[in-house]
């Protein structure tokens, strides 16, 4: 942070590489790293799938099989319907979100300084610390909830669910509609803000620890064990947040698909 004040350093690290202005601006760094995370996921799983053997599996094959079986077990336990779409979706969500979260473990100055060599002045590498990304994923979950509700109950059932529940009387239709709509919208919004809030806080703590390195020797020396301790703890955070996002998605789809719900 040479030549920068603490506030300038923090502001610089929290600024996106973007194009456009206002609502229509596009965060190029978020798009790039989210796509990169997806490519890494697809590459690893496709490579393991092509090299899979019925003999003694390698370490990577064992890891992939453990993750696949674990996710499939969660879906089987919580989603009581056809799992041919939901299980791969849950696996994709967990692995993709985990990889995006894991980018936060890279030292905060490394990628921005590397990008600076190419004339890129701003770069935020953690897609899940961008509310635009988490809201985008949550909106997809929102439409999947509607899709599975219509698939299991039909469009008529969807209308009944949002007009005759929880009070099964025509006089309460406006109240029911407001209550059910708020409940429905709260699902993707809470899903997005939970992931964003945790990852943004984690990123900010890494930045604040990095600020310590520019202070006197005593404070800088304290920053090293703090950085290591937070990085170790953050491994739990990034894994837990990926699991929560996946788990809540499966639960929401299960509730939407449950024919006996109403």
From Swiss-Prot:
One of its GO terms (molecular function) is proton-transporting ATP synthase activity, rotational mechanism. It is a multi-pass membrane protein. PROSITE patterns: ATPASE_A. The keyword Acetylation does not apply. GO terms for cellular component: plasma membrane; proton-transporting ATP synthase complex. It is found in: Cell inner membrane. CDD domains: ATP-synt_Fo_a_6. The chain crosses the membrane at residues 26-46, 86-106, 130-150, 204-226, 240-260. Gene3D superfamilies: ATP synthase, F0 complex, subunit A. InterPro entries: ATP_syn_F0_a_bact/chloroplast, ATP_synth_F0_asu, ATP_synth_F0_asu_AS, F0_ATP_A_sf. GO terms for biological process: proton motive force-driven plasma membrane ATP synthesis. Pfam families: ATP-synt_A. Keywords: ATP synthesis, Cell inner membrane, Cell membrane, CF(0), Hydrogen ion transport, Ion transport, Membrane, Transmembrane, Transmembrane helix, Transport. Its main location: membrane. Belongs to the ATPase A chain family. F-type ATPases have 2 components, CF(1) - the catalytic core - and CF(0) - the membrane proton channel. CF(1) has five subunits: alpha(3), beta(3), gamma(1), delta(1), epsilon(1). CF(0) has three main subunits: a(1), b(2) and c(9-12). The alpha and beta chains form an alternating ring which encloses part of the gamma chain. CF(1) is attached to CF(0) by a central stalk formed by the gamma and epsilon chains, while a peripheral stalk is formed by the delta and b chains. HAMAP family: ATP_synth_a_bact. Key component of the proton channel; it plays a direct role in the translocation of protons across the membrane. This is ATP synthase subunit a. It comes from Haemophilus influenzae (strain PittEE).
């Amino acid at each position: 942070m040479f030549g920068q004040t603490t506030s300038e350093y923090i502001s610089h690290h929290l600024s996106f590489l973007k194009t456009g202005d206002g609502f229509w601006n596009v965060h190029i760094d978020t798009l790039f790293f989210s796509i990169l995370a997806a490519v890494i996921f697809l590459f690893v799983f496709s490579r393991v799938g092509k090299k899979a053997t019925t003999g003694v599996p390698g370490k990577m094959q064992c890891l992939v099989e453990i993750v696949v079986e674990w996710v499939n077990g969660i879906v089987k336990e919580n989603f009581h319907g056809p799992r041919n779409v939901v299980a791969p979706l849950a696996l994709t969500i967990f692995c993709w979100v985990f990889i995006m979260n894991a980018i936060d473990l890279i030292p905060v100055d490394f990628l921005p300084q590397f990008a600076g060599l190419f004339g890129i002045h701003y770069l935020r590498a953690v897609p899940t610390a961008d509310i635009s990304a988490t809201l985008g994923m949550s909106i997809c979950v929102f439409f999947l909830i509607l899709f599975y509700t219509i698939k299991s109950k039909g469009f008529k059932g969807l209308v009944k669910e949002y007009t005759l529940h929880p009070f099964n009387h025509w006089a309460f239709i406006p109240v029911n509609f407001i209550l059910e709509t708020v409940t429905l919208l709260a699902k993707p919004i809470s899903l997005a803000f939970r992931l964003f809030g945790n990852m943004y806080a984690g990123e900010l703590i890494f930045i604040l620890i990095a600020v310590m390195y520019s202070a006197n020797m005593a404070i800088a020396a304290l920053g090293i064990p703090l950085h290591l301790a937070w990085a170790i703890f953050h491994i739990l955070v990034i894994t837990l947040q990926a699991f929560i996002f996946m788990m809540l998605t499966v639960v929401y789809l299960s509730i939407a698909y449950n024919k006996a719900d109403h």
